Amino acid sequence: DEFGTTKPLLECVTSGVLRGAVAMVGCNNPKVRPDSAHIGLMKKMLENDIIVITTGCAAQAAAKAGLMDPEKAKEYCGAGLKRVCELAGIPPVLHMGSCVDISRMLILAAELSKDSGIPISQLPVVGCAPEWMSEKAVSIGNYVVATGIETFLGVDPYVKGSSEIC
């Protein structure tokens, strides 16, 4: 197959070596210290044997923190993820493109679904934008929600109405 196969990843998940994957996207938000939500959440995922795929500003945050360097990042990984990364020669956080390349992540989820026979909504994957700050993050999130994948936005949107509106 020209693009490879998802079978090794599926075997890691079904055997319990990996617990799943998180697709993390989004720019920094002025409401929080830059990169802090991205990096804090990524480190928590890694220690729990959850591989992270990321794009755009979230990917830049990971790179700046050394999470895309296999040697530097392995200290944050649980035993299962550390072993997978060592065997495959990959970092625990994988860069998948620019900020609006969520389609690449969803193509991967669709391939995992096809190869496993499990609906996308039942795969151990989630989407999140821990520091989102723009409308494009909401539209990307809606795309992920439409597939049935659980999706989380980290900063509450300012949606309070005026006291003049009943």
Tell what function each PLM region has.
Residues D1-C166:
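Anaerobic metallocofactor- and corrinoid-dependent redox/one-carbon enzyme cores
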